[in-house]
């Protein structure tokens, strides 16, 4: 089958300059590269054709010969072994390596720099500490720069030379036929350097496992799940790269009196049924101490009283939430006979006075209506 015209293969005019040819090649090479086409044989053949056309048209002498004689210029070894041989590798054609560097990240042009790992530390604090803020001393296990070699990985006085395999890049490229692969340098493991005598403390890594003590300032208003970021307090990076960060995750312990919902606090306040009926004044706890709360007469169980500004100061909004007290009317227990008799007389005195028992009368009315509807 006759070969397609090289200019048509790249989709350019015969008078196209090098920039147009390179731009067309880059677009087509990315489209048909085997790494992107999952083994498609047709795409692989197209990729070879695109490479062959690019090789010829980017070489001034080969392009001139092609323009004059067409494909015949390269048949039977007519032009230094013919097109498509790629005997000199990608670098020999002044453009392949640059283009593949752009397409796949350019990793061989610089030494690998790996930032240190981020670390997590979970800490428990009390509700009081969460509301007021506190400072906690913690101890973490981390990778720190080796003090013996100052993070270089080399014994003092030992030579540190550029890796002869990757020339300091940390990565190597290999050409396999039409394809180029890039891997971590097997000689230096990506460091880009060759150490004559590795540090005996860190074994050439430049980092050692170490316990580190830190003081963590926890602001007022934090809640469970909040994270504090300590920049640069994570693991040390490789080859002198920046350290990672430490994330301190807050867990607020359950409180024996209060429950928290955002900036508001909730608590249950027990009162006697006498206090509920007659009213009065009680003391309720807050995180700032006890405060007085007036209980109006005829207070029912479940009644909520809001004490403004007695909750938690929000870290975002900057204002304090409320303390919400839920009244629980307690039923007296372990009564003696005299007390029981008094209650019986009190109960008898309420007979026929439904208005004095609003919940009961409302409930009984509802029950009566329910059964009346069933009978219809």
From Swiss-Prot:
Annotated Pfam families: DnaJ (PF00226), DnaJ_C (PF01556), DnaJ_CXXCXGXG (PF00684)
Ranges in a coiled coil: none
Cofactors that this protein relies on: Zn(2+)
Residue span, J domain: 5-70
Residues noted as binding Zn(2+) 1 in the record, renumbered to the chain: 146, 149, 199, 202
Name used for this protein in its record: Chaperone protein DnaJ
Zinc finger (CR-type): 133-211
Binding site for Zn(2+) 2: 163, 166, 185, 188
Compartment(s) of residence: Cytoplasm
Gene Ontology CC terms, in alphabetical order: cytoplasm
PANTHER family: CHAPERONE PROTEIN DNAJ, DNAJ HOMOLOG 1, MITOCHONDRIAL-RELATED
Domain comment in the entry: The J domain is necessary and sufficient to stimulate DnaK ATPase activity. Zinc center 1 plays an important role in the autonomous, DnaK-independent chaperone activity of DnaJ. Zinc center 2 is essential for interaction with DnaK and for DnaJ activity.
Molecular functions per Gene Ontology: ATP binding; heat shock protein binding; unfolded protein binding; zinc ion binding
Subunit structure: Homodimer.
Keywords: Chaperone, Cytoplasm, DNA replication, Metal-binding, Repeat, Stress response, Zinc, Zinc-finger
């Amino acid at each position: 089958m006759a070969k397609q015209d090289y200019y048509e293969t790249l989709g350019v005019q015969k008078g196209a300059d090098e920039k147009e040819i390179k731009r067309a090649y880059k677009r087509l090479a990315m489209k048909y590269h085997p790494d992107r086409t999952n083994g498609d044989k047709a795409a692989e053949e197209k990729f070879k054709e695109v490479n062959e056309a690019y090789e010829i048209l980017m070489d001034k002498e080969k392009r001139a010969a092609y323009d004059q004689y067409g494909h015949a210029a390269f048949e039977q070894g007519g032009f230094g072994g013919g097109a498509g041989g790629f005997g000199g590798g990608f670098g020999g054609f002044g453009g392949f390596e640059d283009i593949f560097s752009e397409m796949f990240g350019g990793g061989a042009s610089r030494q690998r720099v790996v930032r240190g790992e981020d670390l997590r530390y979970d800490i428990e604090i009390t509700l009081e500490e969460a509301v007021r803020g506190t400072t906690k001393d913690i101890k973490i296990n981390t990778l720190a720069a080796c003090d013996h070699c100052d993070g270089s990985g080399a014994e003092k006085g030992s030579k540190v030379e550029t890796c002869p395999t990757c020339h300091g890049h940390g990565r190597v490229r290999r050409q396999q036929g039409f394809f180029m692969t890039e891997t971590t340098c097997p000689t230096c493991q990506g460091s880009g350097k060759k150490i004559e005598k590795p540090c005996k403390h860190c074994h050439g890594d430049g980092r050692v496992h170490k316990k580190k003590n830190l003081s963590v300032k926890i602001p007022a208003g934090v809640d469970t799940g909040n994270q504090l970021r300590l920049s640069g307090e994570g693991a040390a990076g490789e080859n002198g790269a920046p350290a990672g960060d430490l994330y301190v995750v807050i867990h607020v312990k359950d409180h024996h009196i209060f429950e928290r919902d955002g900036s508001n606090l909730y608590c249950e306040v027990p009162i006697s049924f006498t206090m509920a009926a007659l009213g009065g004044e009680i003391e309720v706890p807050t995180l700032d101490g006890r405060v007085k709360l007036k209980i109006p007469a005829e207070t029912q169980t479940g009644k909520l009283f809001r004490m403004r500004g007695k909750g938690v100061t929000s870290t975002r909004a900057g204002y304090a939430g409320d303390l919400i007290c839920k009244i629980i009317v307690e039923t007296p227990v372990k009564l003696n006979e005299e007390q029981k008799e008094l209650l019986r007389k009190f109960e008898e005195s309420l007979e026929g006075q439904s208005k004095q028992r609003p919940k009961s009368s409302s409930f009984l009315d509802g029950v009566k209506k329910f059964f009346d509807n069933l009978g219809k």
